[in-house]
């Protein structure tokens, strides 16, 4: 098993929690930009269903059918044990919702009954025990060699040099679709846009959504994803259309709705087992859910109103990524990624954080590496990130996130060598 290539370290704030309040929400200039590291590939398939503007009707939910609580302990300054939300949803805005102050950093979790356990902690522990299909003396030696190379890279700050090389790499690409006046308000950040060559088209008219097809080739196998921003209130309908058109059965959400008092992603799913989320073309039912210590599982049935066709979708929301930086422990994220991989059955896995490049890039990179380890394949973290950046600008957004990719792989390899 061979390894990756170079990098450098110092905490850098990324999109997941650093925006200031906009003063004038009537101008495009109020949309936040990255002020950070930014950056086509295979031909992507086309889909059906025309994209039309759809209306959200969450306001039809009577309050006596549900109660929203924040079950997740805060990882930022304020730490209320529970926050009950009873007010109406705030209207959409011209600029990114990330500009809105919105209270403490919490994951919105419905207080529901009559649910069934979906997975046990024991099963998740088993999934975290990543083991190659072949684990003989030769393979153990290869793993030891790989571990030694990665540890030397970390000690010598080669990882930071790798990241710098990725930042300096010129990746010419066009963002014409995302920059069209009619599409600008669909972007959470004005400089985080999909390449025209890899953007996900909606419907026969190939309408716009801020999402990119990502195809990563490693050891002769292709891994297929959709990397996208967290939905805005105005793009929730488009988001579900994308999920259905691509026949995706897993959504990996790596953000809380609110972090550091800032809205990072709008609540795009139903909040009650009793009432579906009514959209113009789709009806989304919450059928089951499970709140774990570090992520939430939600099971949806999404019905296309015009045909009655129903589509099962599992959403996995990781809730332990801190407002700034990376998780203190890799163990919970390892379990999360492995469970997402086990759950994936159809279509590209849809992965999003807030901007759809930072934490999303970490997820994709580490998922590919874990699959490589299981299949006794070599991997190269720098090459994986380079492939992603050719298809969506700025994937794995910060030096800290890039280093975390190495840290989590090192932890898995070290545990692997302790197995009998």
Swiss-Prot record:
GO biological process: lymphangiogenesis
SUPFAM superfamilies: (Phosphotyrosine protein) phosphatases II
Protein EC: 3.1.3.48
One cellular-component annotation, GO: nucleoplasm
Active site: 353
Tissue expression as described in the entry: Present in many cell lines (at protein level). Widely expressed.
Region feature (Disordered): 1-47, 68-108
UniProt feature, compositional bias: Basic and acidic residues: 1-11
Chain sites annotated for binding substrate: 323, 353-359, 397
Modified residues (Phosphoserine): 76, 120
Keywords tagged on the record: Cytoplasm, Cytoskeleton, Hydrolase, Microtubule, Nucleus, Phosphoprotein, Protein phosphatase
Enzyme class per UniProt: hydrolase
Compartment annotation: Nucleus; Cytoplasm; Cytoplasm, Cytoskeleton, Microtubule organizing center, Centrosome
One MF annotation (Gene Ontology) recorded for this entry: phosphoprotein phosphatase activity
Substrates-to-products reaction catalysed: O-phospho-L-tyrosyl-[protein] + H2O = L-tyrosyl-[protein] + phosphate
Keyword presence, Hydrolase: yes
The keyword Glycoprotein is annotated on this UniProt entry: no
Record InterPro entries: NonRcpt_TyrProt_Phosphatase, Prot-tyrosine_phosphatase-like, PTP_cat, Tyr_Pase_AS, Tyr_Pase_cat, Tyr_Pase_dom
Biased composition (Polar residues): 31-41
Domain called Tyrosine-protein phosphatase: residue spans: 159-412
Family in the record: Belongs to the protein-tyrosine phosphatase family. Non-receptor class subfamily.
Database matches in PANTHER family: FERM AND PDZ DOMAIN CONTAINING 2 (PTHR46900:SF4), TYROSINE-PROTEIN PHOSPHATASE NON-RECEPTOR TYPE 13 (PTHR46900)
Function: Tyrosine-protein phosphatase targeted to sites of actin polymerization in response of varied extracellular stimuli. Has tyrosine phosphatase activity towards various tyrosyl phosphorylated substrates.
Protein name: Tyrosine-protein phosphatase non-receptor type 20
Gene: PTPN20
């Amino acid at each position: 098993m061979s390894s990756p290539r170079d990098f450098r370290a110092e905490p850098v704030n990324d999109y997941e929690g650093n925006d200031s309040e906009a003063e004038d929400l009537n101008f495009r200039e109020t949309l936040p930009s990255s002020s950070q590291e930014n950056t086509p590939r295979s031909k992507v398939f086309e889909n059906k269903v025309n994209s039309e503007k759809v209306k959200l009707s969450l306001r039809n939910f009577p309050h006596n059918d549900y109660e929203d609580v924040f079950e997740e302990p805060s990882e930022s300054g304020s730490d209320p044990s529970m926050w009950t939300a009873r007010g109406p949803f705030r209207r959409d805005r011209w600029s990114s919702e990330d500009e809105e102050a919105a209270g403490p950093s919490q994951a919105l979790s419905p207080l529901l009954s009559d649910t069934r356990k979906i997975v046990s902690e024991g099963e998740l522990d088993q999934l975290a025990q990543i083991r190659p299909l072949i684990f003989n003396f030769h393979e153990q030696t290869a793993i030891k060699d790989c571990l030694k190379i990665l540890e030397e890279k970390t000690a010598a700050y080669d990882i930071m040099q790798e990241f710098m090389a990725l930042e300096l790499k010129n990746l010419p690409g066009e963002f014409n679709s995302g920059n069209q006046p009619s599409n600008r308000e669909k972007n959470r950040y004005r400089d985080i846009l999909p390449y025209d060559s890899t953007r996900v088209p909606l419907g026969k008219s190939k309408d716009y959504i801020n999402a990119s097809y990502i195809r990563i080739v490693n050891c002769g196998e292709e891994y297929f994803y959709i990397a996208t921003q967290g939905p805005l209130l105005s793009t929730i309908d488009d988001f579900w259309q994308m999920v259905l058109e691509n026949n995706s059965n897993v959504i990996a959400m790596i953000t809380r709705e609110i972090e550091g008092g800032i809205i990072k992603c709008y609540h795009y799913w139903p909040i009650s087992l009793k009432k579906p989320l009514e959209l113009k073309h789709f009806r989304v039912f919450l059928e089951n859910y499970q709140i774990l210590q570090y992520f939430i599982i939600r099971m949806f049935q999404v019905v296309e109103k015009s045909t009655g066709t129903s589509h099962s979708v599992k959403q996995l929301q990781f809730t332990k990524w801190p407002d700034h930086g990376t998780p203190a422990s890799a163990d919970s994220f390892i379990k999360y990624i492995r469970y997402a991989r086990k759950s994936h059955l159809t279509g590209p896995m849809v992965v999003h954080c807030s901007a759809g490049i930072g934490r999303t890039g970490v997820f994709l990179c580490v998922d590919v590496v874990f699959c490589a380890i299981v299949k006794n394949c070599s991997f190269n973290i720098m090459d994986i990130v380079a492939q992603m950046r050719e298809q969506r600008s700025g994937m794995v957004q910060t030096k800290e996130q890039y280093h975390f990719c190495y840290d989590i792989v090192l932890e898995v390899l070290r545990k692997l060598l302790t197995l009998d």
